[in-house]
């Protein structure tokens, strides 16, 4: 029996837990079953209590104290420990039916998604290649305020593409916190970010003035230098060559926005194709023999 799930990922501050809460609320409103899994060992509080919490197995605070590791090293240790104790996941997830949407709330350290092979191993165990047989989709969140700084936006886009290539699973990329940029960017301009128009970088490079000589170690000198422009151009060309990344817009305060994102997730994991037709309620049954035709 297949199961269905979504890995909610993205850099710290992108609004992952807030999106999870909005998604759970929407699912409850529409009477859909969900199972909330927290996989962030450093998490502190939630709007909805997780049904399964990695902190019951291991916490980042304990690891940093006992192993004398920093935050990043401690997080890597936590995931290594999880991979050694996968029965912690299987015992809770195996009984779930195909009616559930399993929501995995992931940590914000993007190195887990981009170049450390821990998460691909976890995905392989959870997905249809592993014993749990979960149809998985990754939802990668990027904060919409990144569009104010084009270079920062394309760096975030590059990290999203890196996660797509490394995890090798269906992906939905999301620009979160859209309510914060409505008055900053026009709709026409925002559309170029949603569809990732690499000419945005070229526009910025072409319109920039020649850098003024200054301290080569200063931030302003570095960001206006020719090397930085060449780097931006190379990043834009790489993203354009793959043509993989586009974004959905998300405002968690807007029910229709959450529903639209969920619809794309459902399509990616083929959720509705596996659902059995529901029997009508007794009060909705019609006696066609007595009905006027």
Swiss-Prot record:
A motif (Gly-Pro-Asn (GPN)-loop) lies at residues 70-72. The record marks 72 as: Stabilizes the phosphate intermediate. GO terms for biological process: mitotic sister chromatid cohesion; protein import into nucleus. Residues 272-281 have a biased composition (Basic and acidic residues). Keywords: GTP-binding, Hydrolase, Nucleotide-binding. CDD domains: GPN3. InterPro entries: Gpn, Gpn3, P-loop_NTPase. It comes from the Eukaryota. It holds the Pfam family ATP_bind_1. Residues 282-293 have a biased composition (Acidic residues). One of its GO terms (molecular function) is GTPase activity. The keyword Nucleotide-binding applies. GTP binds at residues 13-18, 176-179. Residues 272-293 are annotated as: Disordered. Belongs to the GPN-loop GTPase family. Heterodimers with gpn1 or gpn2. Binds to RNA polymerase II (RNAPII). Small GTPase required for proper nuclear import of RNA polymerase II and III (RNAPII and RNAPIII). May act at an RNAP assembly step prior to nuclear import. This is GPN-loop GTPase 3.
């Amino acid at each position: 029996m297949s199961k269905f799930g979504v890995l909610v990922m993205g850099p710290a501050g992108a609004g992952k837990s807030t999106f999870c809460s909005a998604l759970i609320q929407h699912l409850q409103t529409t009477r859909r079953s969900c199972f909330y899994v927290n996989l962030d060992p450093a998490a502190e509080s939630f709007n909805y209590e997780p049904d399964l919490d990695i902190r019951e197995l291991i916490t980042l605070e304990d690891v940093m104290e006992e192993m004398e590791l920093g935050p990043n090293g401690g997080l890597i240790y936590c995931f290594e420990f999880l991979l050694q104790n996968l029965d912690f996941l299987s015992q809770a997830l195996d009984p779930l039916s195909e009616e559930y949407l399993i929501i995995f709330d992931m940590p914000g350290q993007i190195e887990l998604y981009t170049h450390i092979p821990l998460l691909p191993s976890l995905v392989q165990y959870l997905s249809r290649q592993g014993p749990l047989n979960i149809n998985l989709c990754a939802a990668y969140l990027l904060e919409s305020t990144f569009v104010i700084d084009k270079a920062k936006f394309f760096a975030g886009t590059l990290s999203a593409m890196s996660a797509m290539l490394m995890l090798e699973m269906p992906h939905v990329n999301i620009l979160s916190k859209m309510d914060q940029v409505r008055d900053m960017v026009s709709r026409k301009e925002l559309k170029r970010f949603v569809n990732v128009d690499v000419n945005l970088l070229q526009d910025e490079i072409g319109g920039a003035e020649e850098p003024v000589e200054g301290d080569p170690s200063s931030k302003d000198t570095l960001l206006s230098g020719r090397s930085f422009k060449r780097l931006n151009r190379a990043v834009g060309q790489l993203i354009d060559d793959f043509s993989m990344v586009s974004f959905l817009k998300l405002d968690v305060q807007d029910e229709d926005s959450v529903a639209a994102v969920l619809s794309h997730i459902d399509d990616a994991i083929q959720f509705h194709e596996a659902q059995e037709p529901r029997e009508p309620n007794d009060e909705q049954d019609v006696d066609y023999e007595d009905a006027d035709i």
